[in-house]
Amino acid sequence: MQTNMKFWLGVFTFAFCMLICIGTFADAYPSKPDNPGEGAPAEDLAKYYSALRHYINLITRQRYGKRSSPEALMMTDLMLRENAESFPKYRYDEPFMW
């Protein structure tokens, strides 16, 4: 009985912690502004478009971190650089045989 109680207490604690973590992740992302509708006044539409522009700027902003450091960019360039031999040859680049 005691082990069963400890088991369910652990399950409940884990589920509660997961709900808290999911809630904090959901609050961290900005919510999309509400559309005022078809027959909305011009002032409401202006506010909506301003909020929408702000929302798009937030979710598409450039993030700076380790990937934007010069060393990381140089490594990426070296890894992705292709030499001339790695490009496939096209059949139409060669002269016609007939």
Curated annotation (Swiss-Prot):
Matching InterPro entries: Pancreatic_hormone-like, Pancreatic_hormone-like_CS
Query: Taxonomically, which superkingdom?
Result: Eukaryota
SMART domains on file: PAH
Q: Biological process GO annotation list?
A: feeding behavior; neuropeptide signaling pathway
What single Pfam family name could you report for this chain, choosing any that match? Hormone_3
Keywords, comma-separated and alphabetical: Amidation, Cleavage on pair of basic residues, Neuropeptide, Secreted, Signal
The record's GO molecular-function terms, alphabetically, read: neuropeptide hormone activity; neuropeptide Y receptor binding
Coiled-coil residues: none
Q: Which residues carry this modification: Tyrosine amide?
A: Y64
Q: Which CDD domains match?
A: PAH
Q: Which residues form the signal peptide?
A: 1-28
A GO CC annotation recorded here is: extracellular space
Q: According to its UniProt record, where is this protein mainly located? A: secreted
Cellular localisation:
Secreted
Q: Which PANTHER family match?
A: NEUROPEPTIDE Y/PANCREATIC HORMONE/PEPTIDE YY, PRO-NEUROPEPTIDE Y
Family indicated by similarity: Belongs to the NPY family.
Task performed by this protein = NPY is implicated in the control of feeding and in secretion of gonadotrophin-release hormone.
Give the protein's recorded name: Pro-neuropeptide Y
Organism from which the protein derives: Torpedo marmorata
